[in-house]
A protein has these predicted regions:
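Glycine/threonine-rich phosphate-binding loop and adjacent beta-strand/alpha-helix elements that clamp
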Residues: 193, 215-217, 227-480
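Short glycine-enriched nucleophile-adjacent loop
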Residues: 39-51, 330
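Accessory cap/linker subdomain of secreted extracellular hydrolases
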Residues: 48-164
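Short beta-strand/loop motif that positions the catalytic acidic residue
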Residues: 165, 171-173
Length: 480
């Protein structure tokens, strides 16, 4: 018999599975769950079903808290489609046969034709082939291509699910996960929204391995407490634990974001600088100070060169620790109706070019040593904010079909862009670096950019000129 397809009965399978386990002679009636990625997402669904034998869960690297498994926000951060679902689909189904595609039911045929006509998709042969086959064996990527908006009611359903989860949970993710978004955000959103005994762990940039073996010492302490009643002290410790890059040490906190956070705006300024000093009033500056910084990005059909604006602080006089969510307020105009905004935060090391020849025989590298920390994404037409769900440090966008609005070319628009959280100490002599771009390119294998876990994004098929303003009336700034 053939499978009924994706995730048809899983909403009740969890409860039935736990019920079966409790009837076994080797079960004492106390059940826990552990797993990563999809196996983490299923733990949240099981917890919401409320079986009394489920005493605790440990979902690490779960998917988004909004939309369930493969929800819109998982694969469209800020409305920008990325290609991780292509990897999931093709690696799983590349060997399976396809038939000649037939007529799709109802509105699905219309959505398919709209996707086939999308010039942005036509730049990517691998993605376009999925459309020509009408998604056979590649349902996840096909659905992302043909349904480029969040369905109405998804957020309300998620928030109802939050209220149903009452079991203790220990969730988390790693710093690597900002590249494909869903795990990094899922852990934070569940921790923030679910009221139950809880703990949160953010680990470093090294990816968890398969089979999953990292942090099992912590998992055992967790379940010794909740399943065996052993006092391991785990619930006496601070609820938040995170790896601080730069300092390379574990830190703890009482909540997330950390209650002691000093939110600090860093303003974009002339000559590619990033400063805590706000722009001077227009009366004190000349017209030149009101002029924008500009970059023009040609599409992938013309170039693989990624254009960008780059802003850096002066070398820091002392260590600066940045921990938590980040947002960018950007005042900008474009000369087309849409673009992607891709925001990159970097730690740039000391400029060794200031050394004299006496200190070495011209051992000056071609580039400054720098380390990417995190990114943010926003498709310009998806800029509408959900004010009730937004915070200053995490803009929350609507992303529904009725909220999509093309940009008026030449109009200066205020964008609030969510940059995913990080935890890093910028050492004295280093610089905080912000880059603004609109494109990334596929440079690796398996629909990835650079390395396995950095998907690229569907970009504009038009040549777009971007103008970024940073004067007193339009104070573009990064909130750290």
């Amino acid at each position: 018999a053939k499978s009924e397809g994706h995730y048809g009965e899983e909403d009740t399978d969890h409860y039935d599975m736990i019920e079966w386990i409790t009837r076994q002679p080797w079960c004492d009636g106390n059940v826990g769950m552990v797993g990563i990625s999809g196996y983490a997402g299923e733990q949240w669904r099981a917890a919401a079903q409320g079986h009394p034998a489920l005493k605790a869960i440990f979902p690490y690297d779960a998917c988004s808290a909004y939309g369930g498994m493969f929800g819109f926000r998982d694969f469209h951060p800020g409305g920008v489609l990325h290609t991780f679902p292509y990897l999931l689909d093709v690696f799983s189904t590349v060997h399976e046969p396809r038939d000649r595609p037939g007529e799709l039911p109802g509105d699905e045929e219309k959505l398919w034709r709209e996707a086939m006509a999308n010039p942005d998709y036509k730049q990517f042969i691998n993605l376009y082939n999925i459309l020509t086959q009408k998604g056979q064996r590649t349902w996840v990527m096909y659905h992302a291509l043909t349904h480029p908006w969040e369905e109405d009611g998804v957020l309300e359903q998620a928030e109802e699910m939050f209220t149903k989860i009452r079991v203790p949970f220990y969730t988390g993710s790693g710093a690597y996960a900002y590249t494909y978004k869903l795990h990094w955000l899922g852990a934070q959103h569940y921790f923030r929204n679910v009221e139950a005994p809880k703990k949160l762990i953010f680990t470093g940039p090294a990816h968890v391995e398969r089979p999953f073996h990292q942090y099992h010492d912590e998992i055992l302490r967790w379940y010794d407490h909740w399943l065996k009643g052993v006092d391991t002290g785990i619930m006496d410790e601070p609820p938040v634990r995170y790896w601080l890059m730069g300092s390379n040490e574990w830190r703890t906190g009482e909540d997330w974001p950390l209650p002691e956070t000093e939110w600090t705006p860093f303003y974009l300024a002339d000559w590619g600088t990033l400063t805590t000093q706000p722009p001077r009033p227009a009366a004190e500056t000349g017209e030149a100070a009101r002029q924008p910084d500009v970059f023009t990005q040609m599409p992938l059909t013309r170039t693989t060169t990624v254009e960008r604006l780059r802003y850096l602080t002066e070398p820091l006089p002392h260590d600066v620790t940045v921990v938590g969510p980040i947002s960018l307020t950007l005042y900008a105009e474009i000369d087309e109706s849409d673009t992607n905004w891709i925001i990159v935060l970097k730690d740039v090391g000391p400029d060794v070019s200031v050394r004299t020849a006496r200190e070495g025989e011209r051992d000056i590298p071609a580039d400054l040593p720098e380390r990417e920390l995190t990114r943010g994404w926003l498709k310009a037409s998806y800029r509408a904010l959900d004010e009730e769900r937004s915070t200053p440090w995490e803009p929350f966008h609507k992303l529904t079909r009725d909220a999509i609005a093309p940009v008026v070319p030449g109009e200066v628009v205020e964008y609030r862009i969510h940059v995913l959280a990080t935890a890093n100490t910028f050492k004295a002599g280093h610089r905080i670096c912000l880059e603004i771009t609109s494109m990334d390119v596929p440079t690796g294998t398996g629909a990835m950019t650079g390395v396995e876990y950095i998907p690229y994004h569907v970009t504009s098929s038009q040549t777009v000129t971007h103008r970024v303003y940073h004067d007193a009336d339009r104070p573009s700034h990064l909130l750290l």
